[in-house]
């Protein structure tokens, strides 16, 4: 959840409410689709074919998530000057820069306003943007809320369509796999085989252990090295499975 929500808000620049809405819809469909996947398997495919189809869809979905596209872009306008906002890093290590020509300044945007990182405290607390602009040349030390404008350009041509395609593939994959994998495990044993309970115990331990390790590893790679690494690892994990 954390990786996906951060991916939506920091890479594609969805608002927090919009990102939570996308995640909620995704989570709801992940839980609902196994009902449809089970019905299709019972009537047409059989459990084994459904599991194979689900696994292929999950691998495709997670690898598709690794195609980031350009992501959203933000621009900052202060008075007559326009800057492109450049972001380096992810999560808590995310650093923002305002770039205009050869000028590149680290900034911080809060509800109070836009601050130039490293500015003098007295200037950073100033309430008059014009007065602050006179304190230092170039980027003002502090511009209060209302004295600047941030515009967001979303990656609707490539990145977002690929994102929703990937989520759709994952949802369909879970629908086929989750509803039928238990049936396949159960079919490995005769009805009264004493090993049956042990087999299901191993199965569920593997699921929970894999979920724990995958969450930690994918989140670490995604936040530390890049979104594509986190989602790509999930794809490799599904492929190996």
How should each PLM-predicted stretch be described?
Residues 8-9, 40-44, 217-226:
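Interfacial helix-cap and linker-helix signal at transmembrane-aqueous boundaries
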Residues 18-19, 53, 192-206:
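Cytoplasmic loop-to-transmembrane helix junctions
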Residues 50-51, 163:
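Primarily marks hydrophobic transmembrane alpha-helices of the MFS/SLC 12-helix fold
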């Amino acid at each position: 959840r954390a990786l996906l929500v951060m991916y939506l808000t920091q890479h594609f620049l969805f608002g927090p409410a919009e990102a939570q809405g996308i995640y909620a819809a995704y989570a709801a469909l992940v839980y609902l689709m196994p009902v449809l996947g089970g019905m299709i398997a019972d009537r047409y495919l059989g459990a084994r074919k459904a599991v194979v189809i689900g696994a292929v869809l999950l691998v495709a979905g997670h690898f598709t998530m690794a195609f980031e596209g350009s992501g959203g872009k933000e621009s900052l306008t202060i008075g007559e000057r326009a800057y492109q906002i450049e972001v380096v890093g992810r999560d808590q290590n995310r650093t923002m820069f305002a770039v205009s020509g050869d000028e590149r300044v680290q900034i911080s945007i809060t509800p109070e306003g836009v601050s130039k990182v490293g500015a003098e405290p007295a200037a950073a607390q100033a309430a008059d943007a014009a007065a602050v602009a006179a304190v230092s040349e170039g980027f003002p030390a502090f511009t209060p809320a209302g004295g600047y404008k941030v515009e967001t350009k979303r990656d609707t041509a490539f990145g977002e369509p690929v994102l929703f395609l990937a989520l759709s593939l994952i949802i369909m994959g879970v629908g086929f796999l989750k509803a039928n994998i238990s049936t396949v495990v159960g079919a490995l044993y005769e009805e009264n085989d004493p090993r049956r309970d042990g087999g299901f115990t191993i199965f569920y331990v593997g699921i929970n252990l894999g979920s724990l390790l995958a969450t930690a590893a994918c989140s670490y790679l995604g936040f530390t090295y890049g979104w594509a690494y986190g989602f790509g690892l999930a794809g490799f994990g599904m492929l190996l499975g």
